[in-house]
């Protein structure tokens, strides 16, 4: 079974093994995660080649040892927040590989999670799947994704989603400042400085701290709402840039997942059958 997380800039995909009854093996999460930038000129060719190459060992193994087929080996579960045109290109590649595409959609309740949104369609499927992944870890979780946007969601130990926040990523904040105020567009800076002595560092450090401040404020509100501190679960491409600082400032358990959406997608696939 293939799992595909199609985001605003990249496709992340992985395979998960199953048993002949069609469910993922106990405790099995995504396998090796492969990331492809979908604005790359070779994206379509690379994806098709990857899918074709992966299919050959499975066919050879079944022919060699007579092992029973995995009933879900030809399934491809797709979670997409990308533009429609990009999604259609991915679906075309999956279809060419003989895979059955199944789409993940936000549900009001799924796998022990009850979302706060009255209209499930309003909650991005990536955030929804992140909640499913967090639920599997147990306890209260503040789920933060540092991707094209910064999203924060609070999930309590009973599986209730308390809602969330959406903010601007540091890279987009820097870009917006440079476009609105050309004098601030002086190139890349060092986000690690405490107080900058030049414009590039000042912009880089401030935009980094804006995203950090969003999470710190959300943490305070989460503690007040729950009456206890939650664990913090980070995902997204920039998660590692914030993990150490958050662990130090919050004195809390901070975990980083490089496959947060894919892990939630695997749990969604099992729940939906």
Kindly label every feature range from the protein language model.
Residues 1-5, 77, 141-145, 233:
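Short glycine-aspartate micro-motif
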Residues 1-71, 160-186, 190-193:
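Short glycine-rich, Thr/Ser-proximal phosphate-binding strand/loop in the N-terminal lobe
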Residues 34, 191-231, 253-254:
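Adenine-nucleotide phosphate-binding core of ATP-dependent small-molecule kinases
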Residues 41-44, 108-112, 260-264:
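A short acidic, often aromatic-flanked loop/helix-cap motif at beta-alpha or helix-coil junctions
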Residues 57-122, 158-162, 169, 200-201, ...:
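Short beta-strand-loop/turn "lid" adjacent to the catalytic site in phosphate-handling enzymes
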Residues 100-103, 108, 112-180, 209-218:
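Phosphate-binding/catalytic loop of phosphoryl-transfer enzymes
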Residues 120-130, 185-195, 273:
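A polyampholytic, Gly/Pro-enriched intrinsically disordered region
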Residues 254-273:
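Glycine-rich phosphate-binding/hydrolytic loop that grips phosphoryl groups
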């Amino acid at each position: 079974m293939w799992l595909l997380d199609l985001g605003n800039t990249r496709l992340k995909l992985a395979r998960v093994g199953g048993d002949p009854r069609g469910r993922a093996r106990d405790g099995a999460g995504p396998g090796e995660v492969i990331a492809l930038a979908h604005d790359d000129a070779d994206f379509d060719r690379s994806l098709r080649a990857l899918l074709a190459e992966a299919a050959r060992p499975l066919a050879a193994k079944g022919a060699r040892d007579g092992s029973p087929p995995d009933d879900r080996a030809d399934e491809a579960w797709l979670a997409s927040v990308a533009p429609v045109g990009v999604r259609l290109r991915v679906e075309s590649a999956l279809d060419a590989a003989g895979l059955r595409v199944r789409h993940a959609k936000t549900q009001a309740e799924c796998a022990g999670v009850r979302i706060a949104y009255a209209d499930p369609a309003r909650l991005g499927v990536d955030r929804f799947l992140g909640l499913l992944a967090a639920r599997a870890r147990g306890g209260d979780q503040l789920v933060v994704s540092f991707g094209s946007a910064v999203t924060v969601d609070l999930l309590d130990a009973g599986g209730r989603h308390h809602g969330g926040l959406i903010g601007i990523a540091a890279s987009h904040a820097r870009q917006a400042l440079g476009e609105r105020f050309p004098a601030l567009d002086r190139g890349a800076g060092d986000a690690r400085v405490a107080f900058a002595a030049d414009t590039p560092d000042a912009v880089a450090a401030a935009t980094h701290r804006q995203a950090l401040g969003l999470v710190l404020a959300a943490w305070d509100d989460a503690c007040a709402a729950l009456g206890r501190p939650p664990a913090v679960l980070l995902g997204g491409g920039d998660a590692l840039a914030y993990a150490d600082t958050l662990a130090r400032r919050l004195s809390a358990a901070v975990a980083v997942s490089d496959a947060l959406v894919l892990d939630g997608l695997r749990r969604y696939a099992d729940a939906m059958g």
